[in-house]
Amino acid sequence: MSFRAARIAAVAVASISLLAACSSSPTTTNSAAISATTSSNSYPTQDVVSSVAEDASLHSALLAADPSAASGLTLGTTYSPGLTGLPHAGQNSSGENIGADVDLRNAIAKLLGTTWSVQNGTFDTIIPGVQNGKFAVGQDNFGVTSAREKVVDFATYLTDGQSLLAPSDSTLNAVTDITQLCGLTIGAGAGTTFQTILQKNAAKCAAAGKTPYTVQYFSDTAPIWLGLANGHIDVYFGPTLSLKYDASHVANVKFLSQISSTPVGFVTAKGSPLAKILAEAVNKLIADGEYAKILAKWSIDGYGVSSSRVNPAATL
C-alpha cells in the first residue's frame, strides 16, 4: 500500500509556492497556499535499538533457514531522503536513515544476529524482486491483500489505514461513508490498496442516486499536491500515518478521517521460512517491550499489532 517514496517528489515541486487557486470545486473555496514544505525540521532522536540483544534461538533458526544470513540479508525498500517519508522512513541532514520502519528492521537485525544490506528500488519492483530472489525481504508499508498473498508471504508488524486529506478550507470535515465523496475528484496512487477500495465501491454513488466520484491515479504524489493546490483535486486518498504526518507538516491541509485499516508487513518469497522467523522476531520485541518503545518514539502507539502473524486473512 506504500505510496511513501513518491511523496518525496511532491516536496520538490510543491514547496516552491504551488499554483494559485482556480477551481469551482464545491468543496474548496481557496486552496492557493498549500505547500508541501515541512513546518519543522525536528524529529525524535532517542535510541530505541541498542538495548536489543541477540536471541540465540532466533539466530540459529535464521542460519538454518538461510546460511547466507551469516553475512547479512538483502532488504528491498524505496529511497526516502529528507523528512517527508516519516513516520515510516526518511533521512536526517547527515544522510542517516530514520523512521519507525528503520528502527524496527534494525531492532530485528540485532535480535537475529545479522545485518541488512539495504537496496533501494521503486515500490512496484520490490515484490517482484522478492519473488525472483533479488531481495530476501521487502519492506515498504506493504498492506496485506489477497492478491499479494498469492505471490509473497507476509509477517505483519503494523496496522496502517486508508484515509483522506483535503485543503483546510474544504467543507468536508469527516467522512464516515464513501458516498460522501460522490461528485468529487479524488487523487490516489496507482496500483495501491486505495485504488482497490475506490474501484470496489465505485457503484455506490449511482446506487444512492448521486453523481459518481472521479478518480485520478498517479504513480507519484506531486500531481496530487498540485491538484489539491489548484482545486483540480478535492481530496487525497492515501495511507493514514503518512497523511496524518502531512497534515502536521504541510501548510493549509487537514486530515479528514480514516476509511478502513489494513495490516502491514514484511514480505518474503512464497514458502520462505523467513516469514515465520520475522514474525517470531517481532513477537519477541513485543514481549520484551522494545516494540512499544519504537512506536512511542514515533507517536504511532495506536497503530501497533498485538502479535505478528504470517499471512493473516486479507480484507482487500
Regions found by a protein language model. Give the residues of each.
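Periplasmic-binding protein-like
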Residues: 159-166, 244-283, 301-316
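Acidic, polar ligand-binding/catalytic clefts
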Residues: 115-179
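C-terminal motif of bacterial Sec signal peptides marking the signal peptidase cleavage site
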Residues: 17-21
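Extracytoplasmic small-molecule ligand-binding "clamshell" domains
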Residues: 30-139
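A ligand-binding cleft/hinge motif common to bilobed small-molecule-binding domains
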Residues: 125, 141-149, 199-200, 227-260
